[in-house]
UniProtKB/Swiss-Prot annotation:
GO terms for cellular component: extracellular region. The presence of a 'disulfide through disulfide knot' structurally defines this protein as a knottin. It comes from Conus imperialis (Imperial cone). Disulfide bonds join 53-69, 60-73, 68-77. It comes from the Eukaryota. This is Conotoxin 6.
Amino acid sequence: MKLTCMMIVAVLFLTAWIFITADNSRNGIENLPRMRRHEMKNPKASKLNKRGCREGGEFCGTLYEERCCSGWCFFVCV
């Protein structure tokens, strides 16, 4: 009985999740929250893209190090 109830709740939750996250081809990006819409129009504006990168003047190591925010490295981030 408990297992059946848990399965029903899980199926309802997953069904609701699918409808919430489904793409609406007519409205496109209009239904997304403002911040997410801005990040989709300009992916470089996302805070996640800058996570772990080093600012200019910090030690990085080798040329073209991906850890630099600018992407350029010559012992220090440029």
